[in-house]
Amino acid sequence: MNTVPGVDRSTGSLGQGISAACGMALGAKVKGRQSRVYTLLGDGEIQEGQVWEACMFASHYQLDNLCVIIDNNGLQIDGDVAKVMSPYPIVDKLEAFGFHVEAIDGHDFTAIEAALAKAKTVKGKPTAIVMKTVKGKDVSFMENEAGWHGVAPNDAQYEQAMAELTAKLNELEGK
């Protein structure tokens, strides 16, 4: 695969990404590499048992070169994450599994940069960054709508979304 430099694999919603990341992180440690491994999970994805098995593995092997990033927007393809199969409280569970946890606003780039920097300094345990986000943020017809999970907009919706996001970007940049 590896069509994007630095991205070794894409995974689906069944929790396989963190298991692959654990293998990559352990392999790097065994080979004496200083590389870091990052994996992105959704809050619906962490309902899968494989995720928690991988968390045990990461903690047991002290994979301090592993950073798990969780998008906690409360929605999944079937609706409200808490109603489908609640993984909450995410932070408490990850800490119980031996992770260093940073809970941040996933729309705050300064907080994201700080959490990623902190992850590099943690020794002896993996890091999880739990990012509270809003699905479809700043797109009027997508925001907080589970129905947009895995659905592409049509041409008119795409144009509207891009116009709204461009307006928001201009606002943030003071234009």
Task: Give names to the regions the model predicted.
Residues 1-60:
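Cofactor-binding active-site loop characterized by glycine-rich and histidine/acidic residues
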Residues 32-35, 82-114, 166-174:
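Conserved thiamine diphosphate
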Residues 41-48, 72-76, 107-109:
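Acidic, glycine-rich active-site loops and adjacent beta-strand->loop/helix elements
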Residues 48-73, 128-131:
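A short alpha/beta connector and helix-capping loop motif
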Residues 61-88, 92-94:
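Histidine/lysine/aspartate-rich catalytic loop segments that bind and position anionic ligands
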Residues 99, 109-175:
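Glycine/aspartate-rich loop-and-adjacent alpha/beta segment that forms the canonical ThDP
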